[in-house]
Amino acid sequence: ETFDGVSWNASVSFKTEIGFIPYITAAEQATLVAGQGAEIGVGQVSDGAFDTSDLFEYGIKGSFLDDSLYFALSIYEQERTDFSAQAIVTNSTTENNGTEFELRWVINDNLVVGAGYTNIKVYNVTAMEEGNQFGFFGIEDLSSVTDASLLYGGAVIGFNLVDDKESARKAGIPENIYTLNATYDFQNGYAVNASLVKADETFSSFSQVVTLPSYTLINAGIFYEADSWTASLNIKNLTDERYFRANFPDLFGSQIVLPELPRHYQAKFSYKF
């Protein structure tokens, strides 16, 4: 027996005389989704169970100043629906919507600058429909427990209740992220670069009881290129910012957060022969 899935996409754009290009894109993709262990379930084959991803995006972009200045603004909504291969932990149905902005400007032969902005919200549609989300609880989830040592050596599991759409937000994803970057080429083999990333605070866990603080990350570097060799030195987290990321937020977000690297250095040398 044979089952069919259909994927399609359509896009319309229009280039105006002044350089603006508005566009609209719609797409649908049918995919056979594997389970947590990369297995294909027998029921999936017999039922012809496909996952469907829907995307709708519109925006405007353009190039100006002899194509030295480029920008793009997009607003999108995406939903992956129909099938969950392993309950709601690894393959849940999600709804994503957001806005993205990008700017690149080649100011002259020496200097290139860029900026970006991302606003995104991701919702666990499966949890909304079922009214709950399974997870491991941390001490912050158990407000009546005053002695945290009572939980040492074990783990409390249960279901987080989902009352509304906002309580079904996927954790670990900052709603707003801002970026700036610049590269200066001295035209003598040397170049320097710097970048800045600023991210909002965000919940670490689906239960929304643990909050990861906002952070500002600055990186900088220097590069040299000769005829036969190149060398570079990059300083990551220049200001030694203390920040964290979530670890499997739908499941372990109340129990574990991961510290990111403090200030560190990366050096690279290459020789061509």
Predicted regions and their residues:
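Extracellular loop and loop/strand-boundary signature of outer-membrane beta-barrel proteins
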Residues: 1, 38-47, 84-90, 96-100, ...
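Structural signature of Gram-negative outer-membrane beta-barrels, strongest in the C-terminal barrel
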Residues: 1-78, 96, 106-108, 118, ...
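Residues that define the transmembrane beta-barrel architecture of outer-membrane proteins
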Residues: 2-6, 52-56, 77, 93-99, ...
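Strand-connecting loop/turn motifs
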Residues: 17-19, 64-68, 106-110, 122, ...
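Transmembrane beta-strands of outer-membrane beta-barrel proteins
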Residues: 22-24, 69-73, 113-115, 180, ...
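Outer-membrane beta-barrel translocator domains and adjoining extracellular loop/strand segments
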Residues: 34-43, 82-89, 120, 125-132, ...
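Gram-negative outer-membrane beta-barrel transporters
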Residues: 77-79, 91-206, 268-272
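C-terminal beta-signal and adjacent terminal beta-strands/loops
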Residues: 198-205, 223-273
